[in-house]
A protein has these predicted regions:
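Extracellular/periplasmic envelope-modification machinery, especially enzymes
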Residues: 239, 300-311, 315-600
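Membrane-interface helix/loop caps of multi-pass membrane proteins
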Residues: 1-338, 578
Length: 600
């Protein structure tokens, strides 16, 4: 392929890729497999870069410095411009704790190491993944990392061994990723460079296959097969599948088949002006669509956007994508000396670093520091939450009577509650909990996030040591998360029956009222002049009713709902003080107030 050749159908393929990603991110129910558009980009990139390197190698004018200069000019300027703007907005809109997480993601993004950062990111109390403005930079990190590998593969492998070597490497890495996906490290595999290398190599192999004369009918059938593989991936692959691994083969093969083909009706359709235009803007559209979505979702604390917000998102994405392409991306891609390019890049990088520093200061200046007691339900180093600390005792340490509190983070928020109640009624409480996990025997651990499973299993085993000897047991949980699992409801019934056989009393606490939006974000937005009101989440009350019905079937169990007490009359405030640390958890102040109303 000539290095000067421009194929409009490839721009059309890019448009399909970016539109599928945007639609999926806007609402994953509209296009369940739309996320594979990223994999299409990887295949296209492998195809084009392989063609460029091999052509220049054949012409004896390949230069590593020129190659990396062109890649940097293509990717970095618009990338840094996006980071600068998003950082300033995050400084204004994000509460300080969330901005700290964002700042860490910026640092990783600047090193093009976002994939590693997000593979390890599981801050239970941080923003949800769909609220992280730079989450999408993981794919750009992988692309830049691949560019460090590909030249070596192509330049130092003998030409006759190149295709077999790449084919064997593709097969080996696909097998490795498929194997790893069936372990408990699926998130790391998803963001792994090694798991994504085969996708680039599908494109590389497509570039290596010599062109042969085939009939028009065969040509068209190949293109149709490619289009069907892509369409099938969009339709039938979902987030629930293990991915990438073998599930990535259909979309990668389909994209490769269309790249190898250029004369079919499908390729001519992809060459139509609307597809070419969107494909030309695809990089900038990809850069901007996700931060806009994440910002809207952060403010609204909801995944699904109402119609007006969706229209706003589409308009802003198109506008900022065009502005980025017209005034940032294009100027840097024009021919200029390497020194001039690097001077501009150094300038933008300097502005980025200064912006991050200024934004960090701005984030804290816009609102005074929030006391720790309002932002957490306890000091992590003092809680037996997801790990054991000492004897886990709260309340009256000298008391003879010991009650065992078990559950997920809604049990962890009861540590100060236990202090208040325990000291008042001369009782010891042992509190054992784990994130997303009600620590009772046979809890369906595989249902929760991968990062929490090992801690969940460990805490269940720890809780077993104290269950039989406890004078009574208190269960607490975020019931709206657990009542969707019939397996959990079955195990809850069994736990209550086993306690009854031991003649052991069990008190099941109702889930505390849940807000639709994080109150700290509401406070921040209102401080910025953005009017936001408090509303309640619709599911917590119905979940309580389901748990209450189960408890009612066991004579040894009691369901206690304190949501009607004065402490919850004006959530998230009580006596003029914030009592929630986020939309569903009480903070230290709230836990103590909750304990006061629970004292007999």
């Amino acid at each position: 392929m000539s290095t000067q050749e421009i194929r409009n159908d490839i721009q059309g393929l890019r448009s399909i890729a970016v539109l599928s990603v945007i639609i999926f991110h806007l609402n994953k129910h509209w296009l369940p497999g739309g996320f594979v558009g990223v994999d299409m980009f990887f295949v296209i990139s492998g195809f084009l870069i392989t063609g460029i390197i091999l052509t220049r190698k054949r012409e004896n004018n390949f230069s590593l410095s020129s190659f990396y200069t062109s890649r940097i000019k293509r990717i970095v300027p618009a990338y840094l411009a996006m980071i600068i703007v998003v950082t300033l907005f995050a400084a204004v809109l994000f509460v300080p704790k969330d901005f700290d997480v964002f700042g860490q993601s910026v640092k990783s993004a600047l090193y093009f190491n976002s994939n590693t950062f997000f593979a390890r990111q599981h801050d239970y109390f941080g923003p949800a993944s769909h609220e992280l403005p730079l989450l999408h930079t993981w794919s750009l990190g992988i692309e830049m990392q691949f560019y460090l590998l590909l030249p070596a593969l192509l330049l130092f492998t003998p030409r006759r061994w190149l295709a077999p070597s790449l084919l064997m490497l593709t097969a080996a890495l696909l097998a490795w990723s498929e194997f790893c996906l069936h372990g408990e490290n699926q998130q790391r595999v998803y963001f792994s460079l090694l798991a994504r290398v085969p996708e680039f190599l599908f494109g590389s192999l497509a570039a290596l296959i010599p062109r042969t004369q085939v009939s028009i009918r065969t040509n068209n059938l190949i293109a149709i097969a490619g289009a069907l593989l892509i369409a099938g991936s969009f339709t039938f692959i979902t987030e629930g599948h293990t991915f990438p691994g073998l599930m990535a083969i259909p979309v990668c093969l389909g994209t490769a088949l269309l790249l190898m083909n250029r004369c079919s009706p499908i390729n001519r359709i992809l060459s139509l002006r609307p597809f070419v235009l969107i494909g030309t803007l695809s990089y900038s559209l990809y850069l901007w669509h996700w931060p806009i979505l994440a910002g809207i979702r952060y403010l609204s604390s909801t995944y699904e956007l109402p119609p007006l917000a969706a229209v706003t998102f589409i308009a802003l994405t198109g506008m900022l994508g065009y502005v980025s392409y017209r005034w940032v991306e294009s100027p840097f891609r024009r021919r200029m000396s390497a020194s001039a390019s690097y001077m501009r890049l150094v300038g933008i990088l300097g502005v980025t670093l200064l912006t991050l520093l200024a934004a960090t200061i701005l984030s804290r200046k816009l609102m005074g520091p929030i006391p720790d007691a309002l932002t957490r339900y306890g000091i992590d180093a003092e809680l037996c939450h997801s790990h054991m600390i000492g004897d886990c005792i709260r309340g009256d340490h000298t008391a003879q009577r010991t009650l065992l509190i078990l559950g997920d983070s809604h049990a962890a928020q009861l540590n100060y509650f236990a202090d208040m109640v325990g000291n008042a009624i001369h009782t010891r409480f042992r509190v054992i909990s784990s994130s997303n996990c009600v620590v009772i025997p046979n809890f369906d651990v595989d249902r929760i996030a991968e990062w929490g499973r090992a801690d969940c299993r460990a805490q269940i085993e720890e809780a077993k040591k104290y269950t039989a000897t406890a004078d009574a047991i208190i269960l607490a949980g975020m019931w709206q998360f657990h009542t969707s699992s019939t397996e959990f409801l079955t195990q809850l019934e069994r736990f209550l029956s086993d306690a009854s056989a031991r003649k052991q009393r069990v008190l099941v606490l109702a889930q505390v009222p849940m807000l639709a939006t994080n109150p700290l974000r509401i406070q921040r937005a209102n401080h910025m002049g953005l009017h936001m009101t408090v509303s309640m989440h619709p599911e917590w009350a119905s979940a309580n009713e389901k748990i209450k019905a189960i408890v009612a079937r066991h004579d040894n169990a009691t369901f206690l709902d304190l949501s009607g007490t004065p402490v919850f009359a004006h959530v998230p405030m009580f006596n003029g003080t914030l009592i929630y640390s986020d939309s569903s958890h009480l903070n230290e102040v709230g836990s103590k107030a909750y304990g006061e109303v629970a004292i007999p």
